Amino acid sequence: MGLKEYLFGFKGENMAAKYLVSQGFEILEKNFHSKFGEIDIIAKKDDVLHFVEVKSTSKDYETIYRVTQNKIYKIIKTINFYMLKYDFDLNYQIDIICIEQNKVKFIQNVSF
């Protein structure tokens, strides 16, 4: 990944975090890494943890299709690691934020 792509993704993740804060979420972590994968944003609202995958594009297509079943599998393994590491006993869900042409689309509680 080149610098241009990295900065574009960074901008999208910041836009997503600002959106979540405006909706009453508390941001706990950004870019949490484990040997299993990465979670872009970990947030909390109403005693529920939200593990958020952020996808951005400047093109005219649905970014949701870039979240594959394999990506969700890696996210789930990373969630399990996170929950054990920090000894959380809260409900959680996986959310996706799509940034398409500077517009935020928030898709909550996804499953495959």
Curated annotation (Swiss-Prot):
One matching Pfam family is UPF0102
Recorded hits in InterPro entries, A to Z, give: Restrct_endonuc-II-like, tRNA_endonuc-like_dom_sf, UPF0102_YraN-like
Record GO terms (molecular function): nucleic acid binding
Q: Which HAMAP family match?
A: UPF0102 (MF_00048)
What family does the entry list? Belongs to the UPF0102 family.
Query: What protein name applies here?
Result: UPF0102 protein CFF8240_0294
Which species is the source of this protein? Answer: Campylobacter fetus subsp. fetus (strain 82-40)
Q: What is the lineage of its organism?
A: Bacteria, Pseudomonadati, Campylobacterota, Epsilonproteobacteria, Campylobacterales
